[in-house]
Amino acid sequence: MAALKEWAVVCKALEEGRQILLLRKGGIMEYRQGFKVKHNKFLLFPTFEHQSKESIQPNYLSMLYSVIQNTPTNGKNKITSYAEVADIKEVSDKSILRKLEKYHIWNDRYIDIRMNYNSKRPMSIILLRVYKMDNPIEVDVKSEWAGCTSWIPIEFPVHSNNDGRQPVLEDRRFNQIVDEIKEVLN
């Protein structure tokens, strides 16, 4: 099963239904081709590198501090959520991203940094349907997973029919937010 590496604070915001989108450009290892959504279903692998209070909106600072206090120290990581891609859009206009600020945790400064990185590539906006796993899994962190790469393989079967996972937002609320975001993007 594929897993997408994402800041732990973002994983927490996704799990709490406080955001349903990701803004991705790609890391150093993906510079030439930019970020690609290689999988429509994947685990969310929380990372603890690079996330900082200088990059997020002030109302998410307490969430960041909570996540930092729970940073794994034993060479293991806990995966507690799973996502399915609902839609993908590419955006090159910073003003559109500013209109989406209530749907994600990043601040304007960080969005500017990400937009300016590999400036010929657009920002990918990935709308996600996120599921909280009833039985989180603990994995040994492998050295080959280190660094700025987005996708990693994790041996874990994902069952069909939402077995063992619950959507973090009920259908009506999720669809309402998707419609609001799509209105901004169109």
Positions of predicted regions on the chain:
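Structured alpha/beta reader/binder surfaces that contact nucleic acids or chromatin modification marks
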Residues: 1-186
